Amino acid sequence: MAKIIGVANQKGGVGKTTTAVNLASALGVLEKRILLIDADPQANASSGLGVEEINFSTYHLLEHSAEARKCILPTTSPNVDIIPSHIDLVAAEIELVDRENREYMMREALKSVKDDYDYIIIDCAPSLGLITINALTAADSVIIPIQCEYFALEGLGKLLNTIKNVQKIHNPDLDIEGLLLTMYDSRLRLSNQVVEEVNSHFPEMVFETIISRNVRLSEAPSFGESILSYDAESKGAIQYIQLAEEVLLRNEKLIKN
């Protein structure tokens, strides 16, 4: 049965979608069966994996209770399928408000495909609205990307409070998989200060893997490819493989315990 991991941060530009796409692809390269769910109306994860024409999307999954299997498409990355997003997903925030059990729509929809995959990765919307609450209610854990730049911790308290509320009301089993430092530049004092600050504030919650600023990483989505397909020898590809290995190791330890 798949472990479901949300990738969330309501602050834009922190490497959220980059992480969702490339962690999914790295796990696929490591021969895990992966379903990526694009739950961001901007649909950058979908276009970043070469998805262009779609009939069903996350919107249909949530708003019209479409069967999950109907919404799944193959991607350019080995062992990675996707439920793509569409701008229509914006409307779901409003349309679901009066629905009974509205926070549980994604959890219910994914039950039918959990046995088909090893991991389900959800690229959450850059907000703390109903779609993100759905993702966190469906998830077993959440990865929070944090950029190594000014105001790195801005908004993190709000996200952690949202996670606590979801744990309290909807999903008591939700864990924080880890905080992931992104856009790191070893030449900059600020980057190194952020690494120290995050590690001191959140000991034992931070991934050892740090994602560096990397030109190839930012180029890959415009070609509809993950960094693993676009340039497997780049620093970005190597670091996302390391992150995937770290996630697998953490989960193997959890299973043993």
Which residue ranges define each predicted feature?
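P-loop NTP-binding core
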Residues: M1-N257
